[in-house]
Regions:
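PRPP-associated nucleotide enzymes
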Residues: 1-122, 130-215
């Protein structure tokens, strides 16, 4: 597993899908300031890494969720990955909107889903876990069984881990924040001394003392 995590991290770094700004952090929609931004949409433009990622998602889904019947992508970043993996595995797929449409059938779930079907959610990354749990809840309210999530990257934040555990949702990510930081330092994408600041952020995102190397 460690080999896979490092291999995926190397792939993401090689296509510059991971950005590091410990001195001028990114601001998330939640208001959290982060030294790292992972744009997994760039995977779609890199065939070799895309094949690696989608094949790995297939492997973990087969291993962790052998009874899966449907794949559901999160809107919008998880849709393409769910479509590719669904094709590779011969499984139906759909996706869940952040809110229902205000026209047509006003669907929030796109694709055919029957009550009782076992669904795995495909997500590109997990931070605090809020958005992916919204998707899980929509699917469960529609009668689906959702044993878990397959994701490309996780920040490994305690808040996200606690939320998923409380909802009885398993997550299996291909790689994680600590591995990305370690590989990035070893391959000179970031200074080794910045790794501690990145981990400080991950451990307590509300504490901004890591910004600019402040203590």
């Amino acid at each position: 597993m460690e080999h896979l995590e490092r291999s995926i991290a190397e792939g993401l770094l090689s296509i510059r899908a991971v950005f590091f700004r410990p001195n001028e952090p990114f601001t998330w929609a939640s208001g959290i300031k982060s030294p790292v931004y992972c744009d997994n949409r760039l995977i779609l433009t890199a065939p070799e890494v895309r094949t690696q990622v989608e094949s790995a998602l297939c492997e973990i889904i087969r291993a962790d969720y052998p009874d899966v019947e449907v794949l559901m992508g999160t809107s919008t970043a998880g849709i393409a990955h769910a479509a590719i993996v669904g094709h590779m595995m011969g499984l139906p797929m759909g996706y869940v909107r952040s809110s229902g449409k205000d026209h047509g059938r006003q669907n929030q779930i796109e694709g055919r889903l029957e009550p009782g079907q076992k669904v795995v959610v495909i997500e590109d990354l997990i931070s605090t876990g809020g958005s992916v749990l919204d998707v899980v809840n929509v699917l469960r309210e529609a009668g689906a069984e959702v044993p878990g999530i397959a994701s490309i990257f996780t920040y490994g934040m305690q808040k996200g881990l606690d939320r998923l555990a409380a909802a009885n949702v398993k997550n299996h990510s291909l790689t994680n924040f600590d591995v990305i930081a370690d590989v990035a330092a070893k391959q000179n994408y970031i200074h080794p001394e910045d790794v501690a600041r990145l981990i400080q952020f991950r451990n307590n995102p509300s504490d901004e003392s890591w910004i600019g190397g402040k203590n």
